Protein backbone atom coordinates (compact mmCIF):
# COMPACT_ATOMS: atom_id res chain seq x y z
CA UNK A 1 0.00 0.00 0.00
CA UNK A 2 1.23 3.53 -0.73
CA UNK A 3 -0.13 6.77 0.73
CA UNK A 4 0.00 10.01 -1.27
CA UNK A 5 1.91 12.91 0.34
CA UNK A 6 -1.31 14.91 0.83
CA UNK A 7 -2.82 11.98 2.74
CA UNK A 8 -5.92 11.86 0.55
CA UNK A 9 -5.24 8.87 -1.72
CA UNK A 10 -4.13 5.32 -1.01
CA UNK A 11 -2.88 2.96 -3.72
CA UNK A 12 -3.27 -0.75 -3.15
CA UNK A 13 -3.18 -4.14 -4.88
CA UNK A 14 -5.49 -7.13 -4.68
CA UNK A 15 -4.81 -10.83 -5.12
CA UNK A 16 -4.99 -12.08 -8.70
CA UNK A 17 -5.38 -8.55 -10.14
CA UNK A 18 -2.67 -7.30 -12.49
CA UNK A 19 -2.64 -3.66 -11.47
CA UNK A 20 -3.75 -1.52 -8.55
CA UNK A 21 -6.51 0.74 -7.26
CA UNK A 22 -6.66 4.36 -6.11
CA UNK A 23 -8.82 4.92 -3.02
CA UNK A 24 -9.96 8.43 -2.08
CA UNK A 25 -10.03 8.73 1.72
CA UNK A 26 -12.30 11.81 1.61
CA UNK A 27 -14.91 10.13 -0.59
CA UNK A 28 -14.29 6.73 1.03
CA UNK A 29 -14.37 5.07 -2.36
CA UNK A 30 -12.22 3.51 -5.06
CA UNK A 31 -11.97 6.24 -7.69
CA UNK A 32 -9.61 4.70 -10.27
CA UNK A 33 -8.28 1.33 -11.31
CA UNK A 34 -5.05 0.74 -13.22
CA UNK A 35 -4.71 -2.41 -15.29
CA UNK A 36 -1.14 -3.32 -16.11
CA UNK A 37 0.12 -5.67 -18.85
CA UNK A 38 -0.19 -9.42 -18.48
CA UNK A 39 2.21 -11.55 -20.56
CA UNK A 40 0.59 -14.28 -22.66
CA UNK A 41 2.32 -17.05 -20.69
CA UNK A 42 0.84 -15.69 -17.45
CA UNK A 43 -2.64 -15.42 -18.98
CA UNK A 44 -2.54 -19.19 -19.53
CA UNK A 45 -1.59 -20.03 -15.93
CA UNK A 46 -4.28 -21.29 -13.57
CA UNK A 47 -4.68 -19.02 -10.54
CA UNK A 48 -3.55 -21.88 -8.31
CA UNK A 49 -0.05 -21.44 -9.81
CA UNK A 50 0.24 -17.79 -8.75
CA UNK A 51 2.93 -17.27 -6.12
CA UNK A 52 1.14 -16.69 -2.80
CA UNK A 53 -2.07 -15.68 -4.63
CA UNK A 54 -0.32 -12.58 -5.93
CA UNK A 55 -0.53 -11.34 -9.49
CA UNK A 56 1.24 -8.19 -8.33
CA UNK A 57 2.74 -7.82 -4.90
CA UNK A 58 4.46 -4.63 -3.81
CA UNK A 59 3.71 -0.97 -4.47
CA UNK A 60 5.55 2.17 -3.39
CA UNK A 61 5.70 5.87 -4.27
CA UNK A 62 8.48 8.25 -5.27
CA UNK A 63 9.54 10.83 -2.71
CA UNK A 64 7.80 13.65 -4.58
CA UNK A 65 4.58 11.63 -4.85
CA UNK A 66 4.51 11.82 -8.64
CA UNK A 67 5.16 8.18 -9.52
CA UNK A 68 4.36 4.71 -8.26
CA UNK A 69 6.55 1.63 -8.56
CA UNK A 70 4.65 -1.64 -8.85
CA UNK A 71 6.14 -5.14 -8.59
CA UNK A 72 4.52 -7.40 -11.20
CA UNK A 73 5.22 -10.65 -9.38
CA UNK A 74 3.84 -13.13 -11.91
CA UNK A 75 4.82 -11.00 -14.91
CA UNK A 76 8.54 -10.54 -14.20
CA UNK A 77 8.50 -6.76 -14.31
CA UNK A 78 8.36 -3.59 -12.30
CA UNK A 79 6.25 -0.73 -13.63
CA UNK A 80 6.90 2.94 -12.98
CA UNK A 81 3.48 4.57 -13.19
CA UNK A 82 2.67 8.27 -13.45
CA UNK A 83 0.26 9.00 -10.62
CA UNK A 84 -1.81 11.55 -12.57
CA UNK A 85 -2.22 9.69 -15.87
CA UNK A 86 -1.60 6.08 -14.79
CA UNK A 87 0.69 5.77 -17.82
CA UNK A 88 3.02 2.87 -17.08
CA UNK A 89 6.60 2.20 -18.13
CA UNK A 90 7.30 -1.52 -17.79
CA UNK A 91 10.82 -2.66 -16.88
CA UNK A 92 11.73 -6.35 -17.10
CA UNK A 93 13.56 -7.13 -13.86
CA UNK A 94 13.61 -10.94 -13.73
CA UNK A 95 11.71 -13.83 -12.25
CA UNK A 96 9.30 -13.19 -9.37
CA UNK A 97 9.70 -9.53 -8.40
CA UNK A 98 8.09 -9.67 -5.02
CA UNK A 99 8.15 -6.35 -3.20
CA UNK A 100 8.87 -2.67 -3.77
CA UNK A 101 10.06 0.08 -1.45
CA UNK A 102 11.39 3.60 -1.93
CA UNK A 103 14.95 4.69 -1.15
CA UNK A 104 15.44 7.05 1.81
CA UNK A 105 15.95 10.01 -0.54
CA UNK A 106 12.83 9.10 -2.58
CA UNK A 107 14.72 8.85 -5.89
CA UNK A 108 14.82 5.08 -6.36
CA UNK A 109 12.56 2.07 -6.19
CA UNK A 110 14.03 -1.12 -4.73
CA UNK A 111 12.38 -4.30 -6.04
CA UNK A 112 13.23 -7.70 -4.60
CA UNK A 113 13.64 -10.27 -7.37
CA UNK A 114 12.95 -13.32 -5.25
CA UNK A 115 13.83 -16.10 -7.71
CA UNK A 116 17.15 -14.47 -8.59
CA UNK A 117 18.42 -13.64 -5.08
CA UNK A 118 18.84 -9.93 -5.79
CA UNK A 119 17.31 -6.48 -5.51
CA UNK A 120 16.81 -4.32 -8.61
CA UNK A 121 17.32 -0.58 -8.15
CA UNK A 122 15.21 1.57 -10.49
CA UNK A 123 15.41 5.33 -10.97
CA UNK A 124 12.01 6.99 -10.67
CA UNK A 125 13.24 9.96 -12.77
CA UNK A 126 14.75 7.93 -15.62
CA UNK A 127 12.41 4.94 -15.31
CA UNK A 128 15.41 2.64 -15.81
CA UNK A 129 17.29 0.12 -13.69
CA UNK A 130 20.51 1.59 -12.32
CA UNK A 131 21.84 -1.30 -10.23
CA UNK A 132 21.35 -4.92 -9.27
CA UNK A 133 22.39 -5.96 -5.76
CA UNK A 134 23.03 -9.61 -4.88
CA UNK A 135 21.42 -10.48 -1.55
CA UNK A 136 20.64 -13.62 0.44
CA UNK A 137 18.45 -16.50 -0.58
CA UNK A 138 14.98 -15.66 -1.95
CA UNK A 139 14.48 -12.01 -0.90
CA UNK A 140 10.89 -11.04 -0.40
CA UNK A 141 9.85 -7.97 1.53
CA UNK A 142 12.38 -5.18 1.45
CA UNK A 143 12.20 -2.04 3.59
CA UNK A 144 14.10 1.20 3.81
CA UNK A 145 14.82 2.44 7.29
CA UNK A 146 16.77 5.10 9.09
CA UNK A 147 18.86 4.62 12.19
CA UNK A 148 19.60 7.33 14.66
CA UNK A 149 23.04 6.91 16.14
CA UNK A 150 23.35 7.90 19.78
CA UNK A 151 26.91 8.48 20.96
CA UNK A 152 28.05 6.24 23.78
CA UNK A 153 28.37 8.02 27.14
Please tell me what each predicted stretch does:
Residues 1-153:
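Predominantly soluble domains enriched in secretory-pathway, periplasmic, or organellar proteins
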Amino acid sequence: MALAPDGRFIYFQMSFFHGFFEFDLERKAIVRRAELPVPDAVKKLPLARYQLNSAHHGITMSGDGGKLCVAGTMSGYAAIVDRKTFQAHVIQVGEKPYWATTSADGRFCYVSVSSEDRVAVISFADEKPVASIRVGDHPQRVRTGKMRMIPAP
